[in-house]
Amino acid sequence: MALIYDVVTSANIKGFYDKQQANVDLSLGEKAFPSKQQLGLKLSFIKGAAGKPVSIKAAAFDTKVPLRDRMSVDLLDEEMPYFKEGMFVKEADRQQLNVLAQTKNQELIDTVLSTIFNDETTLIAGAKARLEAMRMEVLSSGKIHINSNGVMKDIDYGLAVTQTTKSSQEWSNKETANPLADIEKAIETVTERGHVPEAIVLNSKTFSYIKNAKATVKAIKPLAPEGSIVTKAELKSYLSEELGLNILLKDGVFVNDAGESKKYFPDGVVTLVPNGNLGYTVFGTTPEQSDLMGGQAT
């Protein structure tokens, strides 16, 4: 059997990629939405209105237990989007690898294999970029829009109107914007729904909008002379100590299906979230995995 079929296997590609990523931290999306896998492509999730705890009713001894209504829930079903893409191993590389195998020169063999494995891990990097983009789209808008290779699909997680707000003043205008007041108002709204925001997700450009606003300087340094500025450390300290928010900066870009560079998290948008997991990135089974489970792999 040709060397390529012995060496270029899914297990070896995974091992090669894992070694490359050994010292790379998890992305914000991977931390907030850890991965898990299920059988099939049907995703069911429960949407409820849990929020404020309702105190238990008092009762006398030796009386019937009063029954509480369960919270209103909706069971939603979605068909998972399916993505696949391949990359050819060039005929020249295959031929060269087979020739080198006869020489027993492992150093030269490893050089060619490294080129092939790097091509394969490009696909993995592309898949991870797609996942991160979808996670950040959910965080920033509550929706996922897919328009790729003839496939059009929208997934709406049903954010209520009261869960989003738009400032009356553009944060990019430092003369009139008051982002800290807007954030405080949003925190009050979230708290009234029975939740406590513990972190704020935004990109560096939006962070600069907040930092550079004149109203921010006045709030953090009320006695500072005209023209004073607020440092990044001072703003982070204020958000942490005064508003109880941990800063989660999400920067970076990816190339979308139209070949355009796009930011993972949009400018001028912030999202208030609790600490810890926000949900899961659920993977269904691919046709190839399904065949392997059924013993029909070819």
Question: Locations of the language-model features?
Answer:
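N-terminal alpha-helical "arm" segments
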Residues: 1-44
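Short secondary-structure junctions and interdomain/linker hinges
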Residues: 20-27, 130, 134-137, 190-197, ...
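Assembly/oligomerization interface modules of large self-assembling protein complexes
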Residues: 33-102
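Charged, low-complexity intrinsically disordered segments
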Residues: 51-53, 66, 141, 155-156, ...
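Long, contiguous amphipathic alpha-helices that act as assembly "spine/axial" helices in icosahedral shell
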Residues: 84-160, 178, 182, 188-205
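Short acidic (Asp/Glu) and glycine-rich catalytic loops that position anionic groups and cofactors
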Residues: 162-164, 215-216
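Ordered core of a single globular domain
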Residues: 181-229, 233-238
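Sequence/fold signature of self-assembling virion shell proteins
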Residues: 217-298
